[in-house]
Amino acid sequence: MFESKINPLWQSFILAVQEEVKPALGCTEPISLALAAAAAAAELDGTVERIDAWVSPNLMKNGMGVTVPGTGMVGLPIAAALGALGGDAKAGLEVLKDASAKAVADAKAMLAAGHVAVMLQEPCNDILFSRAKVYSGDSWACVTIVGDHTNIVRIETDKGVVFTQADNAQEEEKTSPLGVLSHTSLEEILAFVNAVPFDAIRFILDAARLNGALSQEGLRGSWGLHIGSTLAKQCDRGLLAKDLSTAILIRTSAASDARMGGATLPAMSNSGSGNQGITATVPVMVVAEHVGADDECLARALMLSHLSAIYIHHQLPRLSALCAATTAAMGAAAGMAWLIDGRYDTIAMAISSMIGDVSGMICDGASNSCAMKVSTSASAAWKAVLMALDDTAVTGNEGIVAHNVEQSISNLCSLACRSMQQTDKQIIEIMASKAH
């Protein structure tokens, strides 16, 4: 069944997952600004005394209400300050992993002194944009990130331009392993998952380790909205059944609780989002445990889940008005369906039902309430799988769902790319009015 050699398409699939599935400490939008600030601070010899920062509306939306790990505070200013004073510019999405208690205290003092300003970049044509300008005496350094959470495109200091990506940006775009996703299909992804050597995808088990640890932490502590631990108590009280469906709900939401509540544990992210990584991982883990799957089966199911989620999200803007926990849960539906019966038709039906169910869920910024949407998406995924196992699904006669799952995905993504742009603007306006 399994092939010993890896063909170029499969190698591209593996590279795509390795590029998009990475550890991340803290919500990735404020972390992107923290990285910009850390990279800017690394260009200075003295201590950072002041920070000015500019972000895109979408990054502002996803950074306003989320807790920065280790600080107990929400928002972009504390992320920028801690990045500059305690961040590791070489650590990417884990920029804050080694921030000391002193760095946290100094960052809070900088905020209290009014030395951190975070503003909207206007005009801004980039969905994901963050720029941090840090000052030390008469010296300054400025770092700009565009397009991806860790994609530094320009470094400049008072002495001149240190780095600019403009010259080689087009070449990097050509060589990105994600390019193959524009010319593949779910059937090819499934064929890859079924036949690729286990050793080539063993690395995906790290997602289970990291996101499983977050889930356990969410059940132990009182993080965020503590949805997972609350529902676990309701099970003990007899108000919620102790079954597989509930286990998926509780353990997935608990991981998101810990993630959004500021736990100092990394998530294995997907497509630049910790919550998407959690959603693509934990439901699959729970079902794998239920059916007694070994590590190899778990790895194949996780690879199907994560790669399917990346495949769908690749057709979306990096940030949009569409809650991407829903698309990550479509990947989870594929992984769970594969564990139960492995048929392509079951996987396709489950994804189609997901599109007919949760496709209208909006993203109103990163916050503790993301765990609600993660839990809803995970539950919908399992419901869609249960229907598909009995050959029942939302069909092409209903709504935006088409008779072909690939067209259904395209229909969903076209909504986010076009029609939901105005929705996104309205969400940002509402959130901005609350901040005043």
From Swiss-Prot:
User: What's the domain of life for this entry?
Assistant: Bacteria
This protein is called UPF0597 protein YhaM
Q: Which Pfam families match?
A: SDH_alpha
InterPro entries the record matches:
Ser_deHydtase-like_asu, UPF0597
| Organism, scientific name | Salmonella typhi
Transmembrane spans: none
Q: Which family does it belong to?
A: Belongs to the UPF0597 family.
Q: Which GO terms describe its molecular function?
A: L-cysteine desulfhydrase activity
Q: Which GO terms describe its biological process?
A: L-cysteine catabolic process to pyruvate
